[in-house]
Structure formats: structure tokens, C-alpha cells
């Protein structure tokens, strides 16, 4: 695979390297030679819009896979299943010790099977390429993958004597709802109703913890882990306080329904918060874990003394690199006389692990799919060959997809493993 990247006038964007990584992951070649060259050009600056490198990889490889299936007489779904990553699949080249990296999991075959059933692939492929006057319809399948999360960030929240849970979050709000969704994990673990959760986010002046960037397809994975770590810290402290007040050992108690209960007695979380202020130390944030980021230390120090403080770093193990996957099916109608084409049907099945917010995930899956349709159908990069000035800079020259361009029927689901 040899990829040449038109990079624009500034530093390398890195798309070429990622394209090779994604190709090695999605199609699992036993041996692969990969080269990439980034060229500086006198053209307008550009940056990643979505999935840099992954999109190029799919565009290069999927027509090759489709052509191979036709030449070999193999079903298009079957050829993808044969080459799909499974389990802790290997990817990319080896490191200095000769060890290749691997992913945490891959259930791409399951995504293909689920998508084929939803799309009625076996039924519809028989009618593919049959002519109806000057029109012909065809069906196709393709795979996509991209990095799905990072690790090692901090979670921070306080339960105050008013019984509410005040979450501090460094995540920005991109409109995908992950800004709040990740903290439902902590609320659920504490038995706290969502209407009693107050979230402060996106302004570093408000004493926020060290968080992942709001991009790179990582927020849900990265920050649910951090939220889980913080909630685990709060549960440990709440049980210790209950043992001090009510007697017994911390392991005698459980946290649920806004209470710490055990030995036939209980405390509300509001009472636990008041006691945390009285006890001080680690309970209210005057003593902090050594492993948290210095940025989090400053924020937690500023918030100390207000209630039961939960602060922790995600130190959970991870075996491999986290990636997400999608299997996509589409039906297209082409007018052979005038060359026009229409997308008639589209189904996407995502392998993303545990789904936190189904509706938001559906928006992501179908929204990114429409973005890809735009790249394929109407959005082109055109510039003046002499001066490097952008020419396709208006909607009628570089047209994003409208409701008239996308299929009337679009469905999605998740593997759910």
C-alpha cells in the first residue's frame, strides 16, 4: 500500500500513517508492505474533519476487496468475514522488540452477520446488477474502523451536605451528549438520581480535573473509566465513614439508593458528606492521591472541604488498543444513460462495546455515514493550479449532502457485546 498525501502548506497531518494502520487492522494481511509520502503543496491549509487516515484507507481498499470478490466468485460479505479482525487482532508493524500491537477486542464478523440479516443481503444480492430499462441497482458492503479511546485520566466529584452530586468535568460539549453521558456511570454507582447531579464542564477556571480531549473518538471510553474510578473512590470513603459512625467494618456496608447501609443501620449520602467535612483529610479532599495529574491536584485543592470528595485516576488495566468498527450495507440505483445515481437503502452495524446512550450513538453512526456519502457524491477539493486558491468554496461547487441525497431508509444497530 503506497499512499501519497497532499498535505497543504504546513506540517504533516499524519493521515498516511493512520491509513496503513487501519488497512492492516481491517483486512488482516499476514504480510504487508506499506509506504506513505506527505507532500507540501501550494494549496489552502487543511485539517482533519473526521477519522483522518481511516477514510482514506477504506476508500483505497474497499474497491479492491469488491473487485477481488467478483473475480474469485466469492460473496462480498463472505470475503469480508474471511479477512475480518477477530478478538485481540494484530495490527500495524512490530515495535523495536519485534512485537506487533493488538486491539482489545473485535467482533466484526458478528457485525457483518447482524447487518446482513437486517439488510436482507442474501435475498437482495440476487437482484443486484439486474437491468430495468436504463437503470440498474446494486448492493454493496464495506467495513470501517478507527481508534476508540485512551486511558489514564482523572475523575472528580463532590457529594455535598445538600445531598446533591457535583461533578467536575474537563470534557467540552461538542453536541454529542458525551459531555454528560460519561458521568451517568458515577451516578449509577452511587445510587444518585440523575436530577440530583450537577455537572460543571468545559471551563478550566471552574476547577476541573485532567480529562481527555473532546475529539479522536475517545470521550465515552476514556471518561467513563475515569468516572468509574472516582465513584469507586467515593464508595470506599463512604463505607469507611459509615464504619466510623455506625461501627463494624467498611466491608459490612453497601452504597445504594443515596444511602450507605449495613448492620441494620444506614446513613444518607448527605449525612456522609457532612461527616466527611468533619473528619477532613482524604474524605473532604485535604489529602489527595499521589497518582492524579497536577492539574487535578490544583482543582481538588481549591474544592476541598465542601463534602465527600471523590477523586481518582483511571489506573485500570487494558490489554491492547481500543478500536471501534462498523459494517455498512447499501443499495444504489444508477441511470446508465445519463450517469446519475441514487442511494436507496443503508444499514450500519457498530461494534463499540457497551452502548451508553443509544440515541446519541445512532446519531453518530448515521451522521458520520452521511458525511462519508458527501465525500463520495459531491464534496471535492478543487483549487487553482497556479495560485493554489480554493475554487470549490461555495455550496453549489462543493455540495454537502442534503435530505434529497441520503436514502429515505437508514437503519443502524450495535453488536452489543
Predicted segment positions?
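Short, cationic motifs built from Arg/Lys/His that form the positively charged side of catalytic pockets
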Residues: 48-50, 76-82
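Accessory "access/gating" subregions that flank catalytic or transport cores
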Residues: 81-158, 397-400
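Gly/Pro-rich active-site capping loops and adjacent beta-alpha segments
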Residues: 1-57, 132-417
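ATP-dependent carboxylate activation and anion-phosphoryl transfer catalytic cores
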Residues: 70, 83, 340
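Noncatalytic alpha-helical scaffold of FAD-dependent oxidoreductases
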Residues: 71-73, 78, 191
Amino acid at each position: 500500500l503506497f499512499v501519497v498525501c497532499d498535505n497543504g502548506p504546513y506540517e504533516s497531518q499524519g493521515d498516511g500513517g493512520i491509513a496503513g494502520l487501519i488497512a492492516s487492522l481491517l483486512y488482516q494481511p499476514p504480510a504487508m508492505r506499506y509506504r506513505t509520502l506527505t507532500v507540501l503543496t501550494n494549496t489552502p491549509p487543511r485539517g482533519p474533519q473526521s477519522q483522518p487516515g481511516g477514510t482514506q484507507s477504506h476508500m483505497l481498499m474497499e474497491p479492491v476487496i469488491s473487485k477481488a470478490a467478483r473475480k474469485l466468485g466469492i460473496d462480498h460479505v463472505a470475503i469480508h468475514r474471511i479477512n475480518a479482525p477477530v478478538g485481540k487482532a494484530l495490527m500495524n508493524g512490530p515495535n523495536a522488540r519485534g512485537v506487533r500491537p493488538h486491539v482489545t477486542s473485535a467482533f466484526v464478523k458478528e457485525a457483518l452477520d447482524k447487518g446482513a440479516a437486517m439488510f436482507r443481503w442474501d435475498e437482495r444480492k440476487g437482484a443486484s446488477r439486474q437491468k430495468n430499462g436504463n437503470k440498474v441497482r446494486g448492493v454493496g458492503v464495506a467495513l470501517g474502523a478507527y481508534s476508540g479511546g485512551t486511558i489514564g485520566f482523572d475523575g472528580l466529584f463532590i457529594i455535598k451536605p445538600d445531598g446533591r452530586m457535583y461533578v467536575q468535568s474537563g470534557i467540552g460539549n461538542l453536541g454529542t451528549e458525551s459531555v454528560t453521558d460519561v458521568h451517568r456511570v458515577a451516578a449509577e454507582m452511587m445510587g444518585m438520581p440523575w436530577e440530583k447531579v450537577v455537572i460543571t464542564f468545559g471551563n478550566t477556571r471552574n476547577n476541573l480535573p485532567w480529562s481527555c480531549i473532546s475529539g479522536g473518538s475517545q470521550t465515552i471510553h476514556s471518561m467513563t473509566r475515569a468516572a468509574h474510578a472516582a465513584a469507586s473512590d467515593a464508595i470506599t470513603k463512604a463505607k469507611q465513614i459509615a464504619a466510623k459512625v455506625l461501627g463494624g467494618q467498611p466491608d459490612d456496608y453497601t452504597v445504594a439508593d443515596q444511602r450507605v447501609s449495613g448492620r441494620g443501620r444506614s446513613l444518607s449520602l448527605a449525612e456522609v458528606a457532612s461527616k466527611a467535612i468533619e473528619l477532613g483529610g482524604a474524605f473532604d479532599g485535604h489529602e489527595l492521591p499521589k497518582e492524579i495529574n497536577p492539574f487535578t491536584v490544583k482543582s481538588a485543592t481549591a474544592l476541598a472541604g465542601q463534602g465527600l470528595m471523590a477523586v481518582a485516576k483511571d489506573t485500570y488495566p487494558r490489554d491492547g488498543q481500543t478500536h471501534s468498527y462498523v459494517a455498512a450495507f447499501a443499495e444504489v440505483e444508477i441511470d446508465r444513460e445519463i450517469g446519475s445515481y441514487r442511494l436507496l437503502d443503508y444499514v450500519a452495524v457498530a461494534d463499540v462495546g457497551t452502548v451508553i446512550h443509544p440515541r446519541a450513538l445512532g446519531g453518530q453512526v448515521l451522521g458520520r455515514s452521511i458525511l462519508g456519502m458527501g465525500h463520495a457524491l459531491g464534496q471535492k477539493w478543487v483549487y487553482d493550479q497556479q495560485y493554489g486558491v480554493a475554487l470549490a468554496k461555495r455550496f453549489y461547487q462543493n455540495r454537502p449532502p442534503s435530505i434529497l441525497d441520503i436514502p429515505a431508509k437508514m437503519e443502524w444497530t450495535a453488536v452489543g457485546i
